Amino acid sequence: MASEIFGTAAIFWVLIPAGLLGGALLLKLQGE
């Protein structure tokens, strides 16, 4: 059970920053 929670948390720790960076890149591309 604990390993599942840790695995899910790890996925979010990767996806959230990746999503923020991806959104920033899209805004920069649209701005140009």
UniProtKB/Swiss-Prot annotation:
Compartment(s): Cellular thylakoid membrane
ATP-binding found in the keyword field: no
GO molecular function: electron transfer activity
UniProt subunit comment: The 4 large subunits of the cytochrome b6-f complex are cytochrome b6, subunit IV (17 kDa polypeptide, PetD), cytochrome f and the Rieske protein, while the 4 small subunits are PetG, PetL, PetM and PetN. The complex functions as a dimer.
Gene Ontology CC: cytochrome b6f complex; plasma membrane-derived thylakoid membrane
Mode of membrane association: Single-pass membrane protein
Protein name per its UniProtKB record: Cytochrome b6-f complex subunit 7
Function summary: Component of the cytochrome b6-f complex, which mediates electron transfer between photosystem II (PSII) and photosystem I (PSI), cyclic electron flow around PSI, and state transitions.
Coarse class of the protein's main subcellular location: membrane
Transmembrane intervals: 5-25
GO annotation, biological process: photosynthesis
Gene: petM
Organism: Prochlorococcus marinus (strain SARG / CCMP1375 / SS120)
Family (UniProt): Belongs to the PetM family.
UniProt entry keywords in alphabetical sequence: Electron transport, Membrane, Photosynthesis, Thylakoid, Transmembrane, Transmembrane helix, Transport
